[in-house]
Amino acid sequence: TAYRRQRQMCIRDSSGGVQRMMMDGLFGFDENMQIIPMLATSYEANDEATEYTIHLREGVSFTDGTPWNADALIANVNKWADKSLGLKRTTFLCNVLDHAEKIDDYTVKIYLSQSFGAFISNLAHPATLIMSPKQIEAGEDACAQAPVGTGQYKFVEWVAGDHMKVELNKDWWGYDADVCGGTALADADAGFKSITFKPVAESATRVSAIQAGDAQIMWSVPTESVDTLKGDSNVSVGMGDSIAVWYFFMNTQKAPFNDVKVREAMAYAINKEAYIQVVMNGYGSVATSMVGEEVQHYKGNDPYSYDPEKAKELLKEAGYPDGFTTTLMYSNTTANQKKAEFYKQQLSEVGIDLELNGMENAVLNEKVQGADCAGADAEVDCYLSGWSTSTGDADWGLRPMLATESEPPMSYNISYYENEKVDQLLKDGLATADEDRRGEIYAEVQDTVWKDLPLLCIASDKNIWATSNNITGVYLLGDGSIGMRNARMAAE
C-alpha cells in the first residue's frame, strides 16, 4: 500500500515537528496553530491559575508497551521540574512547577508555585512532549539519543550529523476513532513505512535533492527557489503563513535610542513593503504586532508608513538634525547580510549611518544574549533577529522580549526595555486562567509597545515546503514545524 514506501527528507532546523512525530504532548496544535487535546482530554484550572487538573486519554500506550496513565505523567512532570538536568527550554517553560498529585489512574492535579495562565499553551510546546517512564529511568542520555513516546512514528536510529530514521507505529492511538473521542486524528491509510530525516544546511543542495528525486519532502524552501520548483512538473510547492516575526532591536538604555522620537523615526525610515520584495522575494507580510496572527491573543495595529521626511523631522526634534552613527549586530548568514544591507541603505536616506557588524553565532550570543550588565553598559546598539511564538500563546511572544526581568543574560529583552506598566500587565496575564481577560491584557501590552517602539516589527515570513507531486497531506505549522499526520503517497 502507499504508506509502506520509505520516504527520505531534507530538513534544516525543524526538530520540534520531528519530535512530535515520535512523541505526543498533553496538548498540541491543529493546522491553524489552535490548541487541541492530545494525551489529555480536558482540564480545569482554579481562578488564580495555580492548580490545573488534567484528565488523561485512556487506551494509549507508549511504543515500548508502557501504559499511558497518571503515573507516566507524574514521571514526566518530575523530569521537567528537575533543573539539575539542565534542560534549558523545559525548565524555563516549566519553572513554576511545584508538584503533581495523582487523583486517580487518569487524573492528575498539577500545582504551580505561582500563577501561570499560559500553562496549557506551554504544554503544547515541543519541550513538554511526553516520554516513556522507562526511558526517563534510563537517564537523560537515553532520552536524548533514543526517544520513546506515544507518537505516530517510532524511533529507529540516529547518526549524528547525518540522519535520523523513524518507522510507522501502526498501533498509534490517533488512528482509533474511539480512543480519539469520535473522530480519528489520521486516516487508517495515512503514513509512510519509514522516514529518513537528513539535515542539509545548503539551500541549493536541498533544492537539487527534491528535483532529482533523492528526497521526497523538503523544508524550508528558500524564496529565491520557489519559481524554479513551481516550474518542475515533478514537484509540488506548498505555502502558509508564519507566526515568526522579524525584529530590529534598539537598546533603549543608550543614546540615541533612549529617546522614543528616535525610535519612531526609525520606524518611519524603513519601507516594510520594499523589505518584503527585496529581502523576501515577495513572500512575506508586513508585521502588525510582535506576534503572528495565528497566535492566541494576537492584537494587530496599523504598520508605521514609509515616510522618510517625517523620520527626518523626528530626528531634528530629538536633537539629531544631521542623523547619527550606530552599529547593527547580527549573525553573519547570507540571509541576514542581505537584511542588514537593506537596513543600511534605508537608514542612510534619513542621515543615519548604520555600521554593520556580522559575526559567528557563538560570538554573537556571548556578546548580546550573554551580556551580564546594565543596558547602558551593553555593547549592543541595534540587533537583528526574529522570534517564533512556539507555544501559540501571546505570553511567549511578549514576555521574553519585554519584561525587565528578561534582560540578558536571563532571556531575550535585547532592547533593555523597562516599563513598569508593561511589566505589571505581563504578570497580570499570567495571574488568571480566564482567556477573555488574558486577551484584554495582552491587547493592551501590544498597543503600548506599538507606541513605545522598543523594537521594530518588520515582517513575517511565509512557510514554504516542497514535496514530490505524488505525496499529499504534508504541511508546515505556523511555527515552521512539519506536519504529516495524514501524509501519504498516491497509489501507484
Protein language model features and the residues they cover:
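Surface-exposed binding/hinge segments that line
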Residues: 55, 91-135, 151-159
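Long beta-strand-rich cores associated with HINT superfamily self-processing modules
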Residues: 465-492
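Aromatic- and charge-enriched surface segment that lines or borders ligand/interaction sites
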Residues: 41-86, 103, 109, 256
